[in-house]
Amino acid sequence: INGLESGKYTLEFSYVSYKTVSREISLTGDFKLSQKLVPDTEVLNEVTVTAVENKGITSSTRIGCDAIAHIQPSSFADLLELLPGGMAKDPVLGSPQLINLRSANSLSNADYATSALGTRFMIDGRPVNNDANMQSTPAFSNYGSSYVNYGTDMREISTEDIDNVEIVRGIASVKYGDLTSGLVNITRKRGGKDLHARFKSDMKSKLFYLGKGFEWGDDSDRRTINASANYLDSRSDPRQTRQNWKRLTSSVRFGRDMRNEDFTKSFSVNLDYIGSFDNQKSDVDLDKTEGGMPIETYKSTYNKYSVGTRFSIKSRDGDKLFRSWEGSASVTYENDQINRWRHVSLGKA
């Protein structure tokens, strides 16, 4: 720098991502100065947003609502990427999504693709029936492959209402029956007073969610009501109008927690609906031919209604002979119809 008079000066050295350094110098003539800057880095504490392994005899993983919100799932199948060894991948909702725990088999081997039947799904203490799910045509079709009796379709389970999930990969407790290859225990949110809304859109699907909670009372007698609705419209390939899938789920849940000096009681009633609105799938090349007769027609109707109740009582004194009791009951009605018509022409070989 030219034109400086002799005297004392303060030099300040600064650069992005480096600590600023100030030096006092006495200027008497020309001189050279070198200054080494130290990187300015701040190390934050490790933050893990993933599933938590339970420390116990059974191999199980617990997924909280914070981890669920982090990955922004479209269906329950997206949560499996939080399990040990899970891989993140784009959601494909054009075909049923089946769980595969404690098994190396996949849907690629159709003769042994029934491992998902051995995994029990529990929602708020009640089992999810997976023994009468058709989901697709019972034979080859231009509108989809066959996935009959392959297990619970995870596309039907809305993730927005989930508070936490426990996935047991080891041997589950004896109180859970009708399972051979794992347990998925889902607990949904209860209470709260906020209005929640969610919209998600990508190249293949659009999702809308709206939910509201109500609660009143005190710790001795607390009552809650939760209501929600979720709509999903998926198109795996915009060029294939036949490979689409639409789902509507709604839920109304009532809960009551009572507490006195001796016992803690909990009572809940759930009303749930799941519907798939594929309806009649169409394709210009298949619906209209030169003879005026379609090659194939396809119509699917799926509606599921369920009512469940649960009651539990627990002693606040662990030294008493009676400690706890829990009972649950549920009724489910499913209407799953698939109507398919194919044109078959006879010819000479």
Where would I find each of the regions flagged by the language model?
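Extracytoplasmic beta-strand/coil segments of soluble accessory domains associated
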Residues: 81-132
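Short, acidic, small-residue-rich periplasmic hinge/interaction motif at the N-terminus
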Residues: 12-18, 28-70
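Short Pro-Gly-centered beta-turn/loop motif in secreted/extracellular proteins
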Residues: 2-8
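Transmembrane beta-barrel wall of Gram-negative outer-membrane proteins
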Residues: 196-233, 239-286, 291-326
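N-terminal periplasmic accessory domains that precede
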Residues: 32-36, 76-79, 98-100, 122, ...
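Short, polar/charged loop or turn motifs at beta-strand boundaries
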Residues: 59-82, 100-109, 124, 142
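Transmembrane beta-strand segments of Gram-negative outer membrane beta-barrel proteins
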Residues: 46, 159-167, 174, 182-183, ...
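Short acidic/polar hinge/loop motifs at secondary-structure boundaries
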Residues: 3, 126-168
